[in-house]
């Protein structure tokens, strides 16, 4: 029996390391970081870890908002979504994640594009609309 994608990725410690590196990579990427200017990075970290863990067959349960609701009003372009995917692939490469596993993760996350992208444009680096309401911070 083949191990789950979660297990092949290295479990919770590996997923956490990948998410933290990815979050930092996105924060440094001028093509997309304006969309995260008002984001609670602690919340983002937790939500991403839970989402990736659950999506790959791990024991976590993602309890955040749907991708459509979470990104509604952000004005995310196709170009910005593609830049985010490029950052994710670069993160996977940094951690020597195998091509098979990368493909499986991208196959799970790729369909979310239609829920996240609001503008069919190759433009990147667009600001977060002033009217966008960010999620509340996690209780600490």
Regions found by a protein language model. Give the residues of each.
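Core of compact, soluble alpha-helical bundle domains
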Residues: 1-140
